[in-house]
Amino acid sequence: MPDFDLTVIGSGPGGYVAAIHAARMGARVAILEQDAAGWGGTCLNWGCIPTKSLIQGAEVLQAVRRAGEFGVRVAEPEVDWPAMRGRKDRVVGGMRRGVQGLLEANGVEMVTARGRLAGGTRVSADGRELHGRGVLLAPGSVVALPPVPGVELALTSDTILGVERVPGSLVVIGGGVVGMEFASLFNLLGSRVTVVEMLDQVLAPLDPEVAGAFLRLLARRGVEVHLGARVEEIAVEGGLRRVRFSGGELRAEQVLVATGRRPNTGDLGLEAAGVATDGPAIAVDGHLRTSAEAVYAIGDATAVSMLAHTASYQGEVAVANALGEKRISADYTAIPACVYTEPEIAFVGLSEAQARAAGEEVRVGRFPFSALGRALVLGETDGLVKVVADADGYLLGVTIMGPRATDLIAEAALGLGVGITAAELSHVVHAHPTLPEALAEAALDVAGRAVHVAPRRRR
């Protein structure tokens, strides 16, 4: 008789959420985590949570610096980097213990060991063998380093969290989400920041219009960005790091390589277990099933969408399919993406360019935060909301750059997920004065009816 109904490999936001859902369905569940200090996965320990804790500290610093604008006199604030790191560690530690407590409270057996498929639905765990009715693979991802000479001289998104002081200058290689978040963070903390990106825009696949506006804001804040630039070498010269790229050379105290992540699928025993892969990723169908009987996979290891909330959603779907009577398919239409820069950026669904490329007849509405009462009160007027709808007015996508964009995107995701029109969104009464009013105004603007901007010129 199997020891468990479900054995989960990996305790990140996919694995631990799936384990809890399974336990609450009455299943006997075991979950494996290879690192005793890694419960909660990369997101909690080295990614989402620690970085946002540091970013929050930088935002407080910025708010204090601007206190005079609001009639408040304060002394010039100073960055206490060790204290910021200490707070970050306390937040992470508390949340890690919270995850362990939730698993324990739900009767999930926690095993600190590297899990490996041992044939069928058996999993080996450092000398112990666990036999389950099903297996859920949630091993996450690891930092992907480019094949650049001297790359070992650079920091990664993992190691930069442990630097002893804020660098006076920083070169960030990679203009994706991770790279731009760290660029924004250290710019706020006083570093001279330069970004080198191989593509012709940062934050792809962000709406190009918004990406361009974001670049202009970065330039205003002193961040230098080189687009279409390929890094050729990293070296040490005169006590500094030297970065040679296709457009020239840069020197800085530190270099951060933020060129992406890859599925953490090594040494899982996939091939021997008959689990097919798509490159480095585990291949899954719409039900999150792998090619092996009763083996499912979720999260970054599937490379469907390397987002923590996608992994959690996939975990819920996979558990329902593994243990339930009805099959359900994963739907990624309304998965939002968030970027914790200054200002914040968030998007869900299709950008205008993606919608047009898909052959849609597109209608677009925009509304700037500079015309919004709440944004003016907050003194945060950079950015806009952009709504993309089809010819019948149904939402195709929303992009937001501005204050609390990462919170505001939830309403847009809900609207896109349930399939409403821009007009229906605009008819929802939004409290005044609030930031979500910008979304309602942008939805009104799809039909040229936004109230708090000048009317469009008639042709």
Predicted regions and their residues:
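N-terminal Rossmann-fold NAD(P) dinucleotide-binding loop
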Residues: 15, 179-180
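FAD-site-proximal beta/loop scaffold in flavoenzymes
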Residues: 151-167, 249-326, 415
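Glycine-rich flavin
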Residues: 2-4, 20-27, 33-166, 194, ...
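Short, acidic, Ser/Thr-enriched surface-loop or helix-capping motifs
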Residues: 112, 284-286, 389-390
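Beta1/beta-strand and adjacent pyrophosphate-binding region of the FAD-binding site
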Residues: 1-12, 166-176
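Flexible, glycine-rich terminal cap/loop adjacent to redox cofactors
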Residues: 9-18, 23-37, 42, 49, ...
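Short hydrophobic core segments
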Residues: 7-9, 115, 130-140, 172-173, ...
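Gly/Ala-rich phosphate-binding loop of Rossmann-like dinucleotide-binding domains
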Residues: 19, 23, 183, 187-188
